[in-house]
Amino acid sequence: MDYEGIVYRPPSEARSLIIQVTIGCAHNTCGFCNMYKEKKFRIRSLAEILADLTEVSHNPYAPYIEKVFLADGDALVMKTEDLLVILDAIHRLYPGVKRVASYGTAQDILRKSEEELIRLREAGLGIVYVGAESGDNEILKYINKGVTAEQTIEAGQKLKRCGIATSVTLISGLGGRSKVEEHALSCAKLITAMNPEYASFLTLRLYAVSYTHLTLPTIA
């Protein structure tokens, strides 16, 4: 099995089998992010994905795999029926797997019905990692996140109603010096409203290859 480009995963998925079901990120225009800039987004075919799962299942370590992470940036953009086929194959080929995880954007979560999400949970999708970044809509607009804080909250609450755990990440310093208080308070309010199983802050680092030339406002 060959990965396409650099593959990213959450720290807690360090021991997971990583399977690329999509390449890159469908949005891919966040001003702070360079993770998928070298990739043209596409959804991999079921044949490709199932071939990878079958190939790895012959590895002598396969019986010890307990977690699978569906990469790249937003696996939930896939059709639910295709995801169900993938989840079924995972549990058929890797009977020791206890949890399947993926990244998920608020847009993708909201596009799926609760019935679809429940079916995914019943098929083994245990946790979705959601990058909220901030709870302040001005900041979200500035970084070209593509969603509002209210949409992210709604997506998190929807996952909770469907029994899927949520791990939400926010970015420390994203508002710059001039919006330190607004960023901090809005993040706290967002976490409270979402009530995720896990919440963590990441450190901001800017890259020249980001989609926009993001500069943080500072106090004069």
Language-model regions: role of each:
Residues 58-161:
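Conserved SAM/AdoMet-binding glycine-rich loop
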Residues 75, 107, 135, 173-175, ...:
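Residue-level marker for beta-strand->alpha-helix junctions and adjacent short loops that shape enzyme
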Residues 47-61:
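Short microdomains enriched in Cys/His and/or Lys/Arg
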Residues 29, 34, 124, 163, ...:
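Conserved functional loop/turn residues at catalytic and ligand-binding sites
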Residues 127, 150-210:
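Conserved C-terminal portion of the radical SAM core fold
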Residues 212-218:
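Conserved small/polar residues in nucleotide/adenosyl-binding loops
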Residues 6-51:
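Canonical Radical SAM [4Fe-4S] cluster-binding loop centered on the CxxxCxxC motif
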Residues 41-44, 48, 78, 82, ...:
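Alpha-helix N-cap and loop-to-helix initiation/capping positions
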